[in-house]
Amino acid sequence: MKTLETKKAPAAIGPYSQAKMTGNFLLASGQIPVDPATGEVAGDKIETQAEQSCKNVGAILEEAGLTFDNVIKTTCFLADMADFAAFNAVYEKYFTSKPARSCVAVKQL
């Protein structure tokens, strides 16, 4: 099993890794909308935050030699389901292969 870390995505803030890979199977930790260059949350709009989160996922995939087309399942957490359509507009630009997905609201995000 290989631990993956990249400076192109936010560093883990706890006792976990950005991702683990075994064979061709990658499990990535959840990605928040933090710009790894600044350590700051990317804006205050859902579109900007979704874009940054997707860029962070992309950086981890790249480190593993994978692309968004290799993703088979995602789990998305929104602070407010009213942002669902705006989030999807960004999400579908990255996840064009339409992986299986769960999306829920978590009020304390």
Where are these regions (language model features)?
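Short, polar/acidic, helix-capping and beta-turn segments at strand->helix junctions
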Residues: 1-109
